[in-house]
Amino acid sequence: MFSVFIEHYKNNEKLRLFTTIIVVWLLSRIVMQAMVPVMNLVADTPHNLLYYMNPWDAEWYKELAEEGYKLPRSSGMANWAFFPLYPMVCALIRIITGGYINTYAIGMLVSNICIIIAVYYAVRFAWLELDTDKYDRVDIENIIIFLMFAGPCAVYYGSMYTESLFTMCVVLCFYNTKKKNYMMAGVSAALASATRIVGCTLIVVLFTDMYVSMYKQHRDEERRIVAAIKAFIKDVISDAGKLLALAICPLGIFVYMTFLRGFCGDAWAFYHVQKAWRTQKLFPVIGVLIKSCTGRLGEMSDVKQINGIILGWLCVFTLLMYVIMLVRKHYACGIFGIIALMIPLTSSVMSTLRFIVGSFVVYIGITEALLLTGRNTRRVIMVLLAAAEVICISAWYFWDGLLM
Protein backbone atom coordinates (compact mmCIF):
# COMPACT_ATOMS: atom_id res chain seq x y z
CA MET A 1 0.00 0.00 0.00
CA PHE A 2 2.75 2.41 1.01
CA SER A 3 4.83 1.52 -2.05
CA VAL A 4 1.82 2.25 -4.27
CA PHE A 5 1.48 5.68 -2.68
CA ILE A 6 5.19 6.39 -3.14
CA GLU A 7 4.99 5.40 -6.78
CA HIS A 8 1.93 7.61 -7.26
CA TYR A 9 3.73 10.43 -5.46
CA LYS A 10 6.75 10.18 -7.75
CA ASN A 11 4.66 10.13 -10.92
CA ASN A 12 2.15 12.80 -9.91
CA GLU A 13 3.83 16.20 -10.24
CA LYS A 14 0.91 18.10 -8.69
CA LEU A 15 0.82 15.83 -5.63
CA ARG A 16 4.59 16.06 -5.20
CA LEU A 17 4.51 19.84 -5.48
CA PHE A 18 1.64 20.20 -3.01
CA THR A 19 3.30 17.83 -0.52
CA THR A 20 6.58 19.75 -0.70
CA ILE A 21 4.74 23.01 -0.15
CA ILE A 22 2.91 21.69 2.92
CA VAL A 23 6.11 20.29 4.46
CA VAL A 24 8.10 23.51 3.98
CA TRP A 25 5.15 25.62 5.15
CA LEU A 26 4.84 23.50 8.30
CA LEU A 27 8.56 23.76 9.05
CA SER A 28 8.49 27.54 8.62
CA ARG A 29 5.57 27.84 11.04
CA ILE A 30 7.33 25.62 13.57
CA VAL A 31 10.25 28.06 13.47
CA MET A 32 7.90 31.00 14.05
CA GLN A 33 6.34 29.23 17.04
CA ALA A 34 9.73 28.13 18.40
CA MET A 35 10.93 31.73 18.43
CA VAL A 36 8.14 32.80 20.80
CA PRO A 37 9.77 31.44 24.02
CA VAL A 38 13.11 32.78 22.81
CA MET A 39 11.61 36.26 22.41
CA ASN A 40 9.95 35.96 25.82
CA LEU A 41 13.38 35.54 27.40
CA VAL A 42 14.26 39.12 26.46
CA ALA A 43 10.79 40.68 26.37
CA ASP A 44 9.59 42.88 29.23
CA THR A 45 6.32 40.96 29.29
CA PRO A 46 5.87 37.41 27.94
CA HIS A 47 3.36 37.04 25.09
CA ASN A 48 1.94 34.29 22.89
CA LEU A 49 2.22 33.74 19.13
CA LEU A 50 -0.98 35.66 18.35
CA TYR A 51 0.45 38.79 19.93
CA TYR A 52 3.86 38.58 18.30
CA MET A 53 2.55 37.78 14.83
CA ASN A 54 0.02 40.61 14.66
CA PRO A 55 1.48 44.09 15.25
CA TRP A 56 0.48 47.46 13.78
CA ASP A 57 -2.10 47.16 10.99
CA ALA A 58 -3.31 43.78 12.25
CA GLU A 59 -5.19 45.71 14.94
CA TRP A 60 -7.02 47.64 12.22
CA TYR A 61 -7.94 44.48 10.34
CA LYS A 62 -9.17 42.90 13.57
CA GLU A 63 -11.37 45.94 14.19
CA LEU A 64 -12.71 45.81 10.62
CA ALA A 65 -13.50 42.10 10.87
CA GLU A 66 -15.35 42.61 14.16
CA GLU A 67 -17.01 46.02 13.76
CA GLY A 68 -16.74 47.10 10.12
CA TYR A 69 -15.93 50.61 8.91
CA LYS A 70 -16.23 53.46 11.42
CA LEU A 71 -15.75 57.22 11.60
CA PRO A 72 -12.21 58.60 12.14
CA ARG A 73 -10.43 58.55 15.48
CA SER A 74 -9.35 61.77 17.19
CA SER A 75 -5.90 61.34 15.59
CA GLY A 76 -7.48 61.65 12.15
CA MET A 77 -6.78 58.00 11.37
CA ALA A 78 -9.68 55.96 9.98
CA ASN A 79 -10.03 52.29 9.14
CA TRP A 80 -11.26 53.10 5.63
CA ALA A 81 -7.57 53.46 4.73
CA PHE A 82 -7.66 49.66 4.56
CA PHE A 83 -9.32 47.89 1.64
CA PRO A 84 -12.28 45.59 2.36
CA LEU A 85 -11.77 42.12 0.85
CA TYR A 86 -9.42 40.65 3.46
CA PRO A 87 -11.40 41.81 6.54
CA MET A 88 -14.62 40.71 4.79
CA VAL A 89 -13.27 37.17 4.40
CA CYS A 90 -12.17 37.17 8.05
CA ALA A 91 -15.57 38.53 9.14
CA LEU A 92 -17.37 35.81 7.18
CA ILE A 93 -15.36 33.05 8.86
CA ARG A 94 -15.93 34.74 12.22
CA ILE A 95 -19.69 34.62 11.61
CA ILE A 96 -19.56 30.98 10.49
CA THR A 97 -17.62 29.99 13.62
CA GLY A 98 -19.97 31.96 15.86
CA GLY A 99 -17.29 34.29 17.17
CA TYR A 100 -15.75 31.55 19.32
CA ILE A 101 -12.36 31.72 17.62
CA ASN A 102 -9.95 34.58 18.28
CA THR A 103 -10.12 37.06 15.40
CA TYR A 104 -6.34 37.17 15.08
CA ALA A 105 -6.33 33.37 14.75
CA ILE A 106 -8.95 33.62 12.00
CA GLY A 107 -6.88 36.22 10.18
CA MET A 108 -3.78 34.03 10.41
CA LEU A 109 -5.77 31.04 9.15
CA VAL A 110 -6.95 33.01 6.12
CA SER A 111 -3.41 34.24 5.46
CA ASN A 112 -1.87 30.78 5.67
CA ILE A 113 -4.44 29.20 3.36
CA CYS A 114 -3.95 32.01 0.84
CA ILE A 115 -0.16 31.76 0.85
CA ILE A 116 -0.25 27.99 0.34
CA ILE A 117 -2.43 28.51 -2.74
CA ALA A 118 -0.19 31.38 -3.85
CA VAL A 119 3.00 29.33 -3.63
CA TYR A 120 1.44 26.43 -5.55
CA TYR A 121 0.52 28.64 -8.48
CA ALA A 122 3.70 30.70 -8.13
CA VAL A 123 5.73 27.58 -8.90
CA ARG A 124 3.52 26.73 -11.86
CA PHE A 125 3.83 30.29 -13.16
CA ALA A 126 7.61 30.22 -12.69
CA TRP A 127 7.77 27.06 -14.79
CA LEU A 128 6.03 28.97 -17.58
CA GLU A 129 7.93 32.25 -17.17
CA LEU A 130 11.46 30.92 -16.77
CA ASP A 131 13.32 28.91 -19.39
CA THR A 132 12.83 25.27 -18.32
CA ASP A 133 15.10 24.16 -21.16
CA LYS A 134 17.90 26.10 -19.48
CA TYR A 135 16.89 25.75 -15.82
CA ASP A 136 15.87 22.60 -13.96
CA ARG A 137 12.16 22.53 -13.03
CA VAL A 138 12.86 21.09 -9.58
CA ASP A 139 15.41 23.84 -8.87
CA ILE A 140 12.84 26.47 -9.85
CA GLU A 141 10.27 24.81 -7.61
CA ASN A 142 12.58 24.54 -4.61
CA ILE A 143 13.75 28.15 -4.82
CA ILE A 144 10.25 29.62 -5.15
CA ILE A 145 8.94 27.54 -2.24
CA PHE A 146 11.95 28.45 -0.11
CA LEU A 147 11.74 32.18 -0.81
CA MET A 148 8.02 32.48 -0.13
CA PHE A 149 8.06 30.42 3.08
CA ALA A 150 11.55 30.90 4.50
CA GLY A 151 13.04 33.88 2.68
CA PRO A 152 13.30 37.41 4.10
CA CYS A 153 9.94 38.93 5.12
CA ALA A 154 8.04 35.65 4.70
CA VAL A 155 6.75 36.35 8.21
CA TYR A 156 4.22 38.74 6.61
CA TYR A 157 2.41 35.77 5.12
CA GLY A 158 1.57 34.28 8.50
CA SER A 159 0.10 37.44 10.04
CA MET A 160 -3.31 39.08 9.96
CA TYR A 161 -2.19 41.24 7.06
CA THR A 162 -3.34 41.46 3.44
CA GLU A 163 -0.02 40.26 1.98
CA SER A 164 -1.07 36.61 1.60
CA LEU A 165 -4.44 37.30 -0.01
CA PHE A 166 -3.00 40.00 -2.24
CA THR A 167 -0.06 37.84 -3.31
CA MET A 168 -2.44 34.99 -4.10
CA CYS A 169 -4.53 37.27 -6.33
CA VAL A 170 -1.41 38.64 -8.05
CA VAL A 171 -0.03 35.15 -8.68
CA LEU A 172 -3.36 33.93 -10.07
CA CYS A 173 -3.50 36.98 -12.34
CA PHE A 174 -0.02 36.29 -13.72
CA TYR A 175 -0.63 32.55 -14.03
CA ASN A 176 -3.94 32.90 -15.85
CA THR A 177 -2.54 35.64 -18.08
CA LYS A 178 0.35 33.37 -19.05
CA LYS A 179 -2.17 30.61 -19.84
CA LYS A 180 -4.16 33.12 -21.96
CA ASN A 181 -7.14 32.70 -19.62
CA TYR A 182 -7.72 36.45 -19.56
CA MET A 183 -11.15 36.35 -17.92
CA MET A 184 -9.85 34.56 -14.82
CA ALA A 185 -6.85 36.90 -14.83
CA GLY A 186 -9.24 39.86 -14.84
CA VAL A 187 -11.24 38.38 -11.95
CA SER A 188 -8.02 37.85 -9.98
CA ALA A 189 -7.00 41.45 -10.66
CA ALA A 190 -10.43 42.68 -9.55
CA LEU A 191 -10.08 40.79 -6.26
CA ALA A 192 -6.57 42.20 -5.84
CA SER A 193 -7.90 45.73 -6.37
CA ALA A 194 -10.37 45.11 -3.54
CA THR A 195 -7.47 44.06 -1.32
CA ARG A 196 -4.86 46.78 -1.89
CA ILE A 197 -4.64 49.89 -4.05
CA VAL A 198 -1.82 48.40 -6.14
CA GLY A 199 -4.21 45.70 -7.32
CA CYS A 200 -5.86 48.00 -9.85
CA THR A 201 -2.54 48.29 -11.72
CA LEU A 202 -2.59 44.58 -12.57
CA ILE A 203 -4.39 45.62 -15.74
CA VAL A 204 -0.91 46.32 -17.16
CA VAL A 205 -0.13 42.60 -16.87
CA LEU A 206 -2.97 41.73 -19.23
CA PHE A 207 -2.19 44.66 -21.53
CA THR A 208 1.48 43.70 -21.73
CA ASP A 209 0.82 40.04 -22.45
CA MET A 210 -1.75 40.85 -25.14
CA TYR A 211 0.57 43.35 -26.80
CA VAL A 212 3.63 41.07 -26.69
CA SER A 213 1.58 38.32 -28.33
CA MET A 214 0.69 40.70 -31.16
CA TYR A 215 4.27 41.93 -31.40
CA LYS A 216 5.53 38.38 -31.93
CA GLN A 217 2.97 37.83 -34.69
CA HIS A 218 4.31 40.84 -36.65
CA ARG A 219 8.01 40.03 -36.39
CA ASP A 220 8.49 40.08 -40.18
CA GLU A 221 7.01 43.53 -40.80
CA GLU A 222 9.19 46.64 -41.22
CA ARG A 223 7.23 48.89 -38.86
CA ARG A 224 6.79 46.11 -36.33
CA ILE A 225 5.89 48.20 -33.30
CA VAL A 226 3.27 50.29 -35.12
CA ALA A 227 1.77 47.19 -36.73
CA ALA A 228 1.63 45.41 -33.38
CA ILE A 229 -0.08 48.38 -31.70
CA LYS A 230 -2.71 48.59 -34.43
CA ALA A 231 -3.31 44.84 -34.31
CA PHE A 232 -3.47 44.92 -30.51
CA ILE A 233 -6.11 47.68 -30.45
CA LYS A 234 -8.15 45.97 -33.16
CA ASP A 235 -7.90 42.59 -31.42
CA VAL A 236 -9.00 43.92 -28.03
CA ILE A 237 -11.91 45.93 -29.45
CA SER A 238 -13.15 43.02 -31.54
CA ASP A 239 -12.78 40.42 -28.77
CA ALA A 240 -15.51 40.93 -26.17
CA GLY A 241 -13.84 38.48 -23.79
CA LYS A 242 -10.55 40.37 -23.70
CA LEU A 243 -12.32 43.72 -23.45
CA LEU A 244 -14.40 42.50 -20.51
CA ALA A 245 -11.33 41.00 -18.82
CA LEU A 246 -9.55 44.36 -19.00
CA ALA A 247 -12.64 46.25 -17.86
CA ILE A 248 -13.14 44.23 -14.68
CA CYS A 249 -9.51 44.52 -13.49
CA PRO A 250 -10.14 47.67 -11.38
CA LEU A 251 -13.67 46.60 -10.39
CA GLY A 252 -12.74 45.97 -6.75
CA ILE A 253 -11.48 49.49 -6.13
CA PHE A 254 -14.45 51.01 -7.98
CA VAL A 255 -16.90 49.10 -5.77
CA TYR A 256 -15.01 50.24 -2.67
CA MET A 257 -15.00 53.86 -3.86
CA THR A 258 -18.76 53.65 -4.44
CA PHE A 259 -19.20 52.36 -0.90
CA LEU A 260 -17.05 55.17 0.54
CA ARG A 261 -19.03 57.75 -1.43
CA GLY A 262 -22.17 56.62 0.36
CA PHE A 263 -20.53 55.96 3.72
CA CYS A 264 -18.54 59.16 4.27
CA GLY A 265 -19.24 61.28 1.19
CA ASP A 266 -15.72 60.94 -0.24
CA ALA A 267 -14.96 58.26 -2.82
CA TRP A 268 -11.23 58.96 -2.36
CA ALA A 269 -11.34 58.78 1.44
CA PHE A 270 -8.90 55.83 1.49
CA TYR A 271 -6.33 58.10 -0.16
CA HIS A 272 -7.06 61.35 1.68
CA VAL A 273 -6.81 59.69 5.11
CA GLN A 274 -3.21 58.64 4.39
CA LYS A 275 -2.01 62.08 5.52
CA ALA A 276 -2.75 60.96 9.10
CA TRP A 277 0.07 58.40 8.73
CA ARG A 278 2.44 60.14 6.30
CA THR A 279 2.99 63.66 7.58
CA GLN A 280 6.17 64.51 5.67
CA LYS A 281 5.89 65.93 2.15
CA LEU A 282 8.68 64.99 -0.27
CA PHE A 283 9.07 65.11 -4.03
CA PRO A 284 7.55 61.83 -5.30
CA VAL A 285 9.88 58.87 -5.92
CA ILE A 286 13.13 60.73 -6.69
CA GLY A 287 12.93 63.05 -3.69
CA VAL A 288 11.84 60.22 -1.41
CA LEU A 289 14.70 57.98 -2.53
CA ILE A 290 17.37 60.69 -2.34
CA LYS A 291 16.31 61.78 1.15
CA SER A 292 16.05 58.17 2.34
CA CYS A 293 19.30 56.87 0.87
CA THR A 294 21.29 59.83 2.20
CA GLY A 295 19.71 59.71 5.67
CA ARG A 296 18.10 63.14 5.35
CA LEU A 297 14.46 62.34 6.02
CA GLY A 298 14.43 64.77 8.93
CA GLU A 299 12.50 64.97 12.19
CA MET A 300 9.11 65.13 10.45
CA SER A 301 9.58 61.67 8.98
CA ASP A 302 7.65 58.67 10.30
CA VAL A 303 10.69 56.48 9.51
CA LYS A 304 13.84 56.23 11.62
CA GLN A 305 16.98 57.46 9.86
CA ILE A 306 18.71 54.06 9.74
CA ASN A 307 15.51 52.34 8.59
CA GLY A 308 15.07 55.01 5.94
CA ILE A 309 18.58 54.40 4.60
CA ILE A 310 18.06 50.62 4.50
CA LEU A 311 14.64 50.88 2.85
CA GLY A 312 15.82 53.52 0.40
CA TRP A 313 18.69 51.41 -0.90
CA LEU A 314 16.55 48.26 -0.96
CA CYS A 315 14.09 50.13 -3.18
CA VAL A 316 16.89 51.27 -5.49
CA PHE A 317 18.28 47.75 -5.87
CA THR A 318 14.79 46.33 -6.34
CA LEU A 319 14.03 48.83 -9.10
CA LEU A 320 17.33 47.93 -10.76
CA MET A 321 16.38 44.26 -10.60
CA TYR A 322 13.05 45.03 -12.27
CA VAL A 323 14.90 46.84 -15.07
CA ILE A 324 17.11 43.77 -15.51
CA MET A 325 13.96 41.64 -15.68
CA LEU A 326 12.72 43.84 -18.52
CA VAL A 327 16.03 43.37 -20.33
CA ARG A 328 15.66 39.60 -19.86
CA LYS A 329 12.18 39.87 -21.45
CA HIS A 330 10.10 39.34 -18.32
CA TYR A 331 8.06 42.31 -19.49
CA ALA A 332 4.86 41.93 -17.47
CA CYS A 333 6.77 41.13 -14.27
CA GLY A 334 9.17 44.04 -14.65
CA ILE A 335 6.53 46.62 -15.54
CA PHE A 336 4.17 45.61 -12.75
CA GLY A 337 7.02 45.47 -10.21
CA ILE A 338 8.13 49.02 -11.07
CA ILE A 339 4.59 50.42 -10.89
CA ALA A 340 3.82 48.56 -7.64
CA LEU A 341 6.89 50.07 -5.98
CA MET A 342 6.46 53.56 -7.45
CA ILE A 343 3.06 53.94 -5.76
CA PRO A 344 4.30 53.97 -2.12
CA LEU A 345 7.42 55.90 -3.16
CA THR A 346 5.24 58.86 -4.13
CA SER A 347 5.15 59.78 -0.44
CA SER A 348 7.48 57.66 1.71
CA VAL A 349 9.66 54.57 2.02
CA MET A 350 7.47 53.40 4.89
CA SER A 351 5.95 49.95 4.21
CA THR A 352 7.87 49.55 0.95
CA LEU A 353 9.10 46.12 2.05
CA ARG A 354 5.50 44.95 2.12
CA PHE A 355 4.86 46.39 -1.33
CA ILE A 356 7.97 44.66 -2.70
CA VAL A 357 7.13 41.28 -1.19
CA GLY A 358 3.40 41.52 -1.88
CA SER A 359 3.90 42.26 -5.57
CA PHE A 360 5.35 38.72 -5.92
CA VAL A 361 7.43 39.45 -9.05
CA VAL A 362 10.52 40.05 -6.90
CA TYR A 363 10.61 36.28 -6.36
CA ILE A 364 10.87 35.63 -10.10
CA GLY A 365 13.86 37.98 -10.33
CA ILE A 366 15.63 36.47 -7.32
CA THR A 367 14.88 32.93 -8.49
CA GLU A 368 16.46 33.53 -11.88
CA ALA A 369 19.48 35.18 -10.25
CA LEU A 370 19.96 32.14 -7.99
CA LEU A 371 19.55 29.76 -10.92
CA LEU A 372 22.46 31.49 -12.64
CA THR A 373 24.78 30.64 -9.73
CA GLY A 374 26.48 27.32 -8.99
CA ARG A 375 24.74 24.91 -6.62
CA ASN A 376 27.17 25.43 -3.73
CA THR A 377 27.00 29.21 -4.06
CA ARG A 378 23.22 29.01 -4.25
CA ARG A 379 23.05 26.95 -1.06
CA VAL A 380 25.21 29.45 0.82
CA ILE A 381 23.02 32.33 -0.37
CA MET A 382 19.84 30.49 0.63
CA VAL A 383 21.25 29.81 4.11
CA LEU A 384 22.01 33.52 4.46
CA LEU A 385 18.50 34.39 3.27
CA ALA A 386 17.01 31.98 5.82
CA ALA A 387 19.11 33.64 8.54
CA ALA A 388 17.81 37.01 7.34
CA GLU A 389 14.27 35.71 7.75
CA VAL A 390 15.01 34.71 11.36
CA ILE A 391 16.16 38.30 11.93
CA CYS A 392 13.00 39.56 10.22
CA ILE A 393 10.83 37.41 12.48
CA SER A 394 12.63 38.78 15.54
CA ALA A 395 12.18 42.35 14.29
CA TRP A 396 8.51 41.69 13.53
CA TYR A 397 7.89 40.25 16.99
CA PHE A 398 9.42 43.36 18.55
CA TRP A 399 7.52 45.80 16.30
CA ASP A 400 10.59 47.14 14.52
CA GLY A 401 9.53 49.95 12.17
CA LEU A 402 11.73 48.59 9.36
CA LEU A 403 9.09 45.95 8.60
CA MET A 404 6.04 48.16 9.21
Which stretches of residues belong to each language-model region?
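Membrane-lumen/periplasm interface segments of specific transmembrane helices
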Residues: 28-40, 44, 53, 192, ...
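Short hydrophobic/aromatic helix or loop-helix immediately within or flanking a transmembrane segment
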Residues: 55-70, 75-99, 286-293
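Loop-to-helix entry region of an early transmembrane alpha helix in multi-pass inner-membrane enzymes
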Residues: 80-84, 97-117, 156, 302-312
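Transmembrane-helix signature of polytopic, membrane-embedded enzymes
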Residues: 101-105, 122-150, 184, 331-335
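Multi-pass, polyprenyl lipid-linked donor-dependent membrane glycosyltransferases
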Residues: 114, 142-177, 184, 191-202, ...
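Signature aromatic-anchored transmembrane alpha helix within multi-pass, membrane-resident enzymes
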Residues: 246-250, 372-402
